[in-house]
Curated annotation (Swiss-Prot):
Expressed by the venom gland. GO terms for molecular function: toxin activity. It comes from the Eukaryota. This is U4-theraphotoxin-Hhn1ad. Belongs to the neurotoxin 12 (Hwtx-2) family. 02 (Hwtx-2) subfamily. Residues 23-48 form a propeptide. InterPro entries: Hwtx-2-like. Postsynaptic neurotoxin. Disulfide bonds join C52-C66, C56-C77, C71-C82. Keywords: Disulfide bond, Neurotoxin, Postsynaptic neurotoxin, Secreted, Signal, Toxin. It is found in: Secreted. It comes from Cyriopagopus hainanus (Chinese bird spider). Residues 1-22 form the signal peptide.
């Protein structure tokens, strides 16, 4: 009786884990289809970081504070980097 109960509980646990993993994969695949590919996102982030760093360095040479307005679209310049607000 104990062996049967253990076997049933083990199968139930495996089924739950398998179902959860399948749902996560489905969600990930849907997210990847909707948005931009990761490589394009990385390129956009690198461009924002570069523009912000360059503009901050130019302003620092002139003894001015970094303007927070250089980064757009929900980003702000902080520590010479564009960070998501």
């Amino acid at each position: 009786m104990k062996v049967t109960l253990i076997a049933i509980l083990t199968c139930a646990a495996v089924l739950v884990l398998h179902t959860t993993a399948a749902e996560e994969l489905k969600t990930e695949s849907q997210l990847m289809e909707v948005g931009m590919p990761d490589t394009e996102l990385a390129t956009v982030d690198e461009e924002r970081l570069f523009k912000c760093s360059v503009s901050c360095e130019i302003e620092k040479e002139s003894n001015k504070d970094c303007k927070k307005k250089k980064c757009k679209g929900g980003w702000k310049c902080k520590f010479n980097m564009c960070v998501k607000v």
